[in-house]
Structure formats: C-alpha cells, structure tokens
C-alpha cells in the first residue's frame, strides 16, 4: 500500500491524530485527539480532487444531503480537539464525522450531493462563535467590530450613547426594550437584552421581562441594595431568566457578606468578579467560591500587564460619570484598582474558578478583544505557572479546553441559550469561526452565522482573484439584506414569546427563548467549576485561596499583539 509522510498528509488534508499545532504566536500547543475522517477516503474540493460527480459527490437530492460541508477541519471545543468533516443542514450542524459519497465510499456519515457547497477546512481551525455577555450597547458599530473578531452572540443592555448606558448594561423599561429589539433586527448578530434590575418591588421588573428582556442587570449606579437584589432574583425565578450583577463598590448598603446573603442561594452571574470593573472593595473576588455564583471577568484586566493599573483610572472616571476635581470621586476610582486582586484573577482563571470572560464594551472593555485577551491570559499563565494537571509536555489540550469554554459554552449555559449556541454539536446553530493556526484568536478568516457566511477577510473586490490587497473584514451575504433575518437570532424570554412580541413589534429575525437559567450552579460551568474558599486582606489586598497566596508578576510582553497589528 502506498503511504505518504505525515508532513505531506498534513499539507494535503490537514493535521491528523497525534499531529500538533501552535496557536498563533503563543506558547500553547494543541494535539489532535481523534480523526473522524477515513484514511484513503478523504474528501477535498478542487481541480483533480475528490469532490466530483460520481466520486466524492453522490447523485442524491438535497433532502438527503448536507447544504454545506466543511472538509477536514480541526475542531477546538470544550468536548474535544478533533479532526472531522462538519456538515450543515438548514442552518444547523447536522453531522460531525465523515462526509462523502456512500455509494462508493465506506464510513460515510454525511452525504455530499449536487446541492452541497464546500468550504475547505484543510489546515484550518474551526471554533464555535464567541459569546460576549457584558455588552453596553453604546453604539451599533460595536456589533460589526465584535463579529469581525469571532463573536457571534452579544448579551447586554443599553439604548445608545446615553449617560445611563455608558455606565450600566441595562435597557430600561418596555419602551426602550421594544425600540432596541427593532433596531437589532438589522444586524448579523445573535442578541439578547438585559433590563434594569434595580427595584424593590417586582412590577417594574416583570414588565421588562414580558417586553422581551432575557434577564435583568443589577448595577450599583442604580442602587444595588439587598432589597433590590432579593426582588430582582425573585422575578428571575418566576420567569426563568438570568440576573447579572455589578455590586456595591462603596459598601454603602452592606459588605460582600450582605450581598451574598441577599442571594439566598439563588443563581446569579457576577460581572467583573475581580472588582476593577466594580463591586465590593476590596473583596468581591470572594464571590467566585460560592456554588450559586457564576463568575465572569471583563477584558480590561486580562491579562495582568505592566500597563493594566495605569490605564484603569481614566477609564473609570469616564465610564462612571466621575469628576476628577472631586476628591471623593478620585477615591472611589482608586478603591477599585488593586494590583493584588488583578494578579490573583489571572491565577483564578487558570485554575477554573472564574468561569467566563467578556468585554464590558466601551465601558472599560474592548468589544473586539474578548478572544484575544482570553488566549493572552492562557499563554501568560502557561509561561508563569507551567502545565496544568491533565496536560503533558506534548500538548496543552486541557488548558485550551478550559479557556475556550470561558467565551463559548459557559456563557451560553449561564444565560439559557446553550440549547442553541455555544459549541460545535449536532443540532446547534451553525455559528462557526475559521482560523488559520498562525492567526488563531487574532484574525479569523471566515465567520458563519446560521450556516451562511456573514463576514470574511476579503481582498479587493475588483481584483481578478479574491486575495489581493487591501484585505480587510467585510460583511458577506449572510450579513446583508434578508440574509440577516434568516441567519441570526434574537433571544427573548418565555413570557415575551407567549405575548407574541415578534409580531407585535414587527420583528423579522428568528426568535429563540432562553431557558434553564435558574437550575444551574457553578458545577455546571464546564472546565471552570472550582469553588475555592477565598479571603482578601483588607489592608494589603493579598488574596488567599484555600490557604494559598495567589500572586503573579505582570507581563511585559504579550503574544497576539504588535506582531499582528500595525496600529
């Protein structure tokens, strides 16, 4: 039997079991765990290649075939790092296995026919679209920026560049919720809105959920008191929606113990749980050890670098409408910026105590850098802390699964949308992101929404081929016209679905209901479920987890940075 070398095979069909890839310019290595394709029966499109009539392409009608097949792709997801053909049917993932022509090929699990489009995955990495759960909808241009970075779902609140939205991720009240839902109909992005959760009586909260909010946001700038927390969580329990919280930095209505007690064991998503983004000073970080708390970070503190502390003060003053001429405002800002807790945050991510990572878009965070900052943190931790248990000198597969879960499956579970998005699994919406390994996490090649190409790095449209410069990100057909309505989702509550707000508001996008938001716990956070006992020294701010001091040095140099960007 004729054989080819591993190098030649990888060059033709992409890496196979046992082959390793470096992620961008990081120190992270992945190793393919399993290859679902069949050696000698690989399908590949092109002149003189396999996917031709009577060869790798069958004669079957479209009802029996995939609409799209991604050939020979390396998948990175929470469940594995594998090589497979990915099939898409009616906008959803229909098969992860071996595509081809079953009339002449063995082991076929998905059929290629005359109605099948092919996307070459050889040498590419495919991941699920990112999910950013901390969005201030300050300007609609954020959506394009996020999409081009590989984010396909945005959850948060706001009404545009209003003072309240600059600081808080809330779309307050039924009128604003309706207007925002009508506006986001025009964008190729899955979106869910959070209403304002700060009230001590339920009526004003319940009406926001009924109007279409998928959850409520408690923010200290609106008054996150124990009474407001208790009321908001009660409404969430009644409506099967999630609550996100930015706690009381000034400790005006109680300390971290007061807030944890107000939760009464009920599930809640704590934003920027380290505290630089806001929350009980100096020890809100303790919350990540609670079984009912689903903790996330925002990206301005990710990872801890020599510049992190300096840039935060000015960001804080702008975002929270503070005045540099008022001493109390300066003191408020400075109380949130602590070297010790930011350093500990790096380690708590690496150990799986912090479960998610998001942006805090235009409100201290950068909407297009969720994915970059995640992998920069992973690289920094490998360099400073070495291998994680489960990893080997050959690969960092477990660490990679831990970190990718922070912006894919775990935010999906937290906000009740994991039945639709958040991973590459059969039956889920085909929101997929393609990366060349050298550009992984930095610059995607293709972004699919609902099985159609919504955005891509595209060359000069007047060129004779697609690749000549200038190459930059452009919306593709699923990102324009009616394609948007059929390739993107608007998430709403069950009560809003019952009220048929889609028709009442004149929405054209498909709508999906959030569910199972209240029964989840920290134990459901995949690869990120550690619940340490944390204490913070009130004078030195040193963080102790299960008796161990958590500290690390700031990074002076990061991967995925200047090497990839001119500006």
UniProtKB/Swiss-Prot annotation:
Needed co-factor(s): Ni cation
Annotated residues for binding of Ni(2+) 1: 134, 136, 217, 360
Active-site annotation: 320 (proton donor)
Positions that bind substrate: 219
Coiled coil: none
UniProt signal peptide: none
Cofactor remark from the record: Binds 2 nickel ions per subunit.
One example of a Gene Ontology biological process annotation: urea catabolic process
Subcellular location: Cytoplasm
Post-translational modification: Carboxylation allows a single lysine to coordinate two nickel ions.
Subunit structure: Heterotrimer of UreA (gamma), UreB (beta) and UreC (alpha) subunits. Three heterotrimers associate to form the active enzyme.
Similarity comment: Belongs to the metallo-dependent hydrolases superfamily. Urease alpha subunit family.
Record's protein name: Urease subunit alpha
Provenance organism: Polynucleobacter asymbioticus (strain DSM 18221 / CIP 109841 / QLW-P1DMWA-1) (Polynucleobacter necessarius subsp. asymbioticus)
Lineage: Bacteria, Pseudomonadati, Pseudomonadota, Betaproteobacteria, Burkholderiales
Originating gene: ureC
């Amino acid at each position: 039997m004729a054989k080819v070398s591993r190098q030649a095979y990888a060059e033709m069909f992409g890496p196979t079991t046992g082959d390793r890839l470096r992620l961008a310019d990081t120190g992270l290595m992945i190793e393919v765990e399993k290859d679902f394709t069949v050696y000698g029966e690989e399908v590949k499109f092109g002149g003189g290649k396999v996917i031709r009539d009577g060869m790798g392409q069958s004669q079957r009608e479209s009802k029996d075939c995939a609409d799209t097949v991604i050939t020979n792709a390396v998948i990175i997801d929470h469940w594995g790092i594998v090589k497979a053909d990915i099939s898409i049917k009616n906008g959803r993932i229909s098969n992860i296995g071996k595509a081809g022509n079953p009339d002449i090929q063995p082991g076929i699990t998905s059929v290629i026919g005359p109605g099948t489009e092919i996307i070459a995955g050889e040498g590419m990495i495919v991941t699920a679209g990112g999910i950013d759960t901390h969005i201030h909808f300050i300007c609609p241009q954020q959506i394009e920026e996020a999409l081009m970075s590989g984010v396909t779902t945005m959850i948060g609140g706001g009404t545009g560049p209003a003072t309240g939205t600059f600081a808080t991720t809330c779309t307050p009240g039924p009128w604003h919720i309706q207007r925002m839902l009508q506006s986001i109909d025009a964008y190729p992005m899955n979106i869910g809105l959070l209403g304002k959760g700060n009230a001590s009586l339920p009526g004003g909260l319940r009406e926001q959920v009924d109007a279409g909010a998928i959850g409520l946001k408690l923010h200290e700038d609106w008054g996150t008191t124990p009474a407001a927390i208790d009321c908001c969580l009660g409404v969430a329990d009644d409506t099967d929606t999630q609550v996100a919280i930015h706690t009381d930095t000034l400790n005006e209505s109680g300390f971290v113990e007061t807030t944890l007690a107000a939760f009464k064991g009920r599930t809640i998503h704590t934003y920027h749980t380290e505290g630089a983004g806001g929350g009980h000073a100096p020890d809100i970080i303790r919350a990540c050890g609670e079984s009912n708390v689903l903790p996330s970070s925002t990206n301005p503190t990710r990872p801890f670098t020599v510049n992190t502390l300096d840039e935060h003060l000015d960001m804080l003053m702008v975002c929270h409408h503070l005045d540099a001429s008022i001493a109390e405002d300066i003191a408020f800002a400075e109380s949130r910026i602590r070297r010790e807790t930011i350093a500990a945050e790096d380690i708590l991510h690496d150990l799986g105590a912090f479960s998610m990572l998001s942006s805090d878009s235009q409100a201290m965070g950068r909407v297009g850098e969720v994915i970059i900052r995640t992998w920069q943190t992973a690289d920094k931790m490998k360099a400073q802390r070495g291998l994680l248990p489960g990893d080997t000198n050959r690969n960092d597969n477990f660490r990679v699964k831990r970190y990718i879960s922070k912006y894919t499956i775990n935010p999906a579970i937290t906000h009740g949308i994991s039945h639709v998005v958040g991973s590459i699994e059969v039956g889920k919406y085909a929101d997929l992101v393609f990366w060349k390994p050298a550009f992984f996490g930095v610059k995607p090649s293709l972004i699919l929404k609902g099985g159609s190409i919504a955005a891509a790095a595209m060359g000069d449209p007047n060129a004779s081929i697609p690749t000549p410069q200038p190459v930059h990100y452009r919306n593709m057909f699923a990102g324009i016209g009616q394609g948007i309505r059929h390739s993107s989702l608007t998430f709403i509550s069950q009560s809003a679905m019952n009220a048929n707000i889609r028709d009442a508001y004149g929405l054209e996008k498909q709508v999906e209901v959030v569910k199972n938001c209240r029964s989840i716990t920290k134990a459901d956070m995949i690869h990120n479920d550690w619940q340490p006992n944390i204490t913070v020294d009130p004078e030195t701010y040193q963080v102790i987890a299960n008796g161990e001091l958590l500290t690390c040095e700031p990074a002076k140099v990061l991967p995925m940075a200047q090497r990839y960007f001119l500006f």
